[in-house]
From Swiss-Prot:
A biological process from GO: regulation of cell shape
Gene (UniProt): murI
SUPFAM superfamilies in the cross-refs: Aspartate/glutamate racemase (SSF53681)
Protein name as catalogued: Glutamate racemase
Gene Ontology molecular function: glutamate racemase activity
Source species: Escherichia coli O139:H28 (strain E24377A / ETEC)
Amino acid sequence: MATKLQDGNTPCLAATPSEPRPTVLVFDSGVGGLSVYDEIRHLLPDLHYIYAFDNVAFPYGEKSEEFIVERVVAIVTAVQERYPLALAVVACNTASTVSLPALREKFDFPVVGVVPAIKPAARLTANGIVGLLATRGTVKRSYTHELIARFANECQIEMLGSAEMVELAEAKLHGEDVSLDALKRILRPWLRMKEPPDTVVLGCTHFPLLQEELLQVLPEGTRLVDSGAAIARRTAWLLEHEAPDAKSADANIAFCMAMTPEAEQLLPVLQRYGFETLEKLAVLG
C-alpha cells in the first residue's frame, strides 16, 4: 500500500484497518524521541502510536521555559483533538523538566516524562565518577541538580552540555555520517581526565542514537545509561492501571509542525519505525 505525505487536511488514505488499540503519543522537539518510542514499542508492540516532533522550534535546549511549556501544551492539545489519547510520553529531557506539571493539570490521561538516569548510573559506577551528557538547558536546570543531590550525592558528577550532539544525531537519521573527530572535541574535557567517568548518562533522548559512535570515542568499558527501558515499563503500568479507554484502529502516524524538505526526507526513517504517514499538524498559538 502506498504511503503518502499529507498536509493535515487530506484523509489518511494509507491507514490500515485493524482492531482498536490504545493510542499513545510520543513527543519530542526532534527525532531523538524515536529512541524512547523504540523501547516502548519493543515492550508494547500492539498499540496505536503517534509520533510528533516540533521541527519549527527545534532544538528546545536553547529556548526559555515559558516558551517550552506553552509550545508543548499547544502541540499535545492539537494531537488530542485529532486522536483521543490514552497516554502521552514527553520524550525530551528539556521539555519534561519544565512542562509536566502543566500537562498533568490540563489533561486527564497519564503523562510520562523523561529525566536523566542519574539514579541507576550512581548504582552502576565502579570508580564513583559519573558523566552526564545532555543539552546545556538540562545541565543548567535546578531539577537536574536536585536529582544529583538526591540520588548521586556520593558520586563525582562530571557534566557536559552540548547542542552540537543533538544536531549530529539528527544528521545521522538523515543518513549523514557522524564525525568521530567532532565527538572527540565535544568529549575532550572527559578524555583529558586522569580518571574519566566509567558510567555516562545519556541525558538527551537524541544521544542513544549516537551510542555506537560514542563507544568508539569513550574509554573502553565505559557504560552508557539512558531512561528508555524504564519509561517503557512505566508506560505499560500506567496503561494497565490508570489510562482512559482511548483507542483507535488507524495506522500509526507521525506529525511534524512544518512540512519542510528536511521533514519529508525523514519519511523513510519514520517508516522503518512503523509510521506509515507523515502529516503536518495544525497548532494554535
